[in-house]
């Protein structure tokens, strides 16, 4: 699963949310290292400028003390409650430019090394390739 891949990449907490275009929301699909209620999380993109931006096209955002003040108020309260701390990665994954899921991950709030961020990015690319291959097979 995507969560297992992220755990193998060193992320101690992760949340994978799928885009539900009919309901215009993100729905939690997989979670690791988070409270049980994380599995029931739904996010409304219109409530967060950061989430809206990430859903426009596949992209990555690294939150750390230097930019946390800028972005914290723009994050959904549900995510802030689950991922307390100043070190967080958010990445939207997609196929052919269309975003299908949002991944949120960290190392229990600890600072992320550049190597950890690169590993997260590479793992995310692998998940995207798998999504693309799965989609071509017709589901």
Label the predicted regions:
Residues 3-6, 12-20, 26, 52:
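Short, hydrophobic-rich beta-strand element in sensory/regulatory alpha-beta domains
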Residues 16-47:
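GAF sensory/regulatory domain recognition
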């Amino acid at each position: 699963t995507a969560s297992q891949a992220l755990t193998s990449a060193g992320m101690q907490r992760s949340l994978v949310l799928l885009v539900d275009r009919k309901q215009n929301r993100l729905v939690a699909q997989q979670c690791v290292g988070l409270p049980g209620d994380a599995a029931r999380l739904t996010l409304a993109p219109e409530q967060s400028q950061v989430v809206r931006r990430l859903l426009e096209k596949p992209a990555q955002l690294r939150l750390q003390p230097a930019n946390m003040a800028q972005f914290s108020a723009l994050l959904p309260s549900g995510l802030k409650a689950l991922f307390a701390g100043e070190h967080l990665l958010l990445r939207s994954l997609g196929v052919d430019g269309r975003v299908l899921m949002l991944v949120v991950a960290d190392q229990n709030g600890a600072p992320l090394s550049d190597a950890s961020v690169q590993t997260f990015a590479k793992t995310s690319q692998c998940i995207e390739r798998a999504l693309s291959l799965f989609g071509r097979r017709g589901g």
